[in-house]
């Protein structure tokens, strides 16, 4: 990405630093420092940044769900991750390029009640294990007969 100051100089247009350009919503879409470092960004209609690139070619892009929660990230090195959320905005799933993943469950107050990840760690009691009294439930290969919860 060529710094805007070079283009302005070539065109004979006077300017001063920092050079800052904003979109109609006030989001900063370009910024350049006096040392030539610069970056540009793009935003969605809700004001969430969806793309960012600096003057050295480093970039990342972001995606969001309808509630504004970040659901996907990817950068110029090939790294990526994705996230999922419940209706209350609690993160329920995370996965990245390396195959690492995490699953989360929450109670009605938003407190995390269960966590499981790709290395086999499990903490808490999954919602699927909470059944009626007298039922047999299997958790981590162990069977339990439930009493009243």
Task: Describe each region flagged by the PLM.
Residues 1-21:
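Extreme N-terminal leader/activation tails
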């Amino acid at each position: 990405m060529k710094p805007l100051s070079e283009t302005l100089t070539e065109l004979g247009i006077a300017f001063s630093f920092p050079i800052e350009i904003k979109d109609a919503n006030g989001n900063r879409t370009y910024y350049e420092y006096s040392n030539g470092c610069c970056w540009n960004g793009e935003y969605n209609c809700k004001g969430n940044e969806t793309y960012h690139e600096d003057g050295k070619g480093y970039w990342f892009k972001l995606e969001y769900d309808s509630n504004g929660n970040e659901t996907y990230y990817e950068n110029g090195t090939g790294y990526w991750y994705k996230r999922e959320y419940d209706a209350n905005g609690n993160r329920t799933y995370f996965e990245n390029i390396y195959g690492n993943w995490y699953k989360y469950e929450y109670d009605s107050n938003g407190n995390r009640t269960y966590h499981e990840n790709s290395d086999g760690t499990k903490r808490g009691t999954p919602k699927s294990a909470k059944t009626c009294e007298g039922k047999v439930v299997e958790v981590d290969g162990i069977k339990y007969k439930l009493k009243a919860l």
